[in-house]
Amino acid sequence: MMGHPPKESILDLLKASTARLLTSGICSARLDAHVLMSSVLGCDHAWLIGHGNEVFPHYLCEEYEGLIKRRELREPVAYLTGIREFWSIPFGVTPDTLIPRPDSETLVETALKTMPKNTEKIIDLGTGTGCLLLSLLHERDTLQGVGIDISRGAVAVAEKNARTLGMLERAEFHVGSWGVRTTLIAGGPFDVVISNPPYIPELEIEDLAPDIRWFEPNHALNGGGDGLDAYRLISKALP
């Protein structure tokens, strides 16, 4: 395993993995090594630190090595573990979905502050993992919502997240385009429309980090020539 003796401690293996990821130009090397090992061992960060002198289980060496190799090639940690936390909620992610970002939590905060208390139904355009819609439903148990995404794979992920979180009775997801006005009619009427559409100008995609431009879905990043294509489509589709 990694060119080291078979009976390697958890701490030594973490140090070796961190060094490899740093050599690959990954700034978050230490954190990534810890997250991937926690995923393999099924433990949290505190457990790793407290048991650092224990021998890493031999039967898990191949799995951990495989994840480190994939991370060296810049595959995002969230795709490797299949999980990304958003709004303190663990969401399943796959390469069919954009990885939820912490700064997108401001959309949830703003919606909660501005939505009237009597809001009953919301629609999320470009739902991806469903993180925006499901986070809002998590905060307000009287809400119902519909998520729309052009990707069948993303819709499947969002539905699975809703099921895991026990929200499938209040949330439904459909394949569709946010530029079609009928999208806003089916399942409506809606009190609130939420969306975090792609906003990166097409020519700037190549300037993104390899982790993003090589692995995350282009349609969820590419906002067209000026980054505003999706916004124009949505504004035309709104009642």
Give the role of each language-model region.
Residues 102-207:
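Conserved SAM/SAH cofactor-binding pocket of Class I
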Residues 1-47, 53:
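Non-catalytic accessory regions of SAM-dependent methyltransferases
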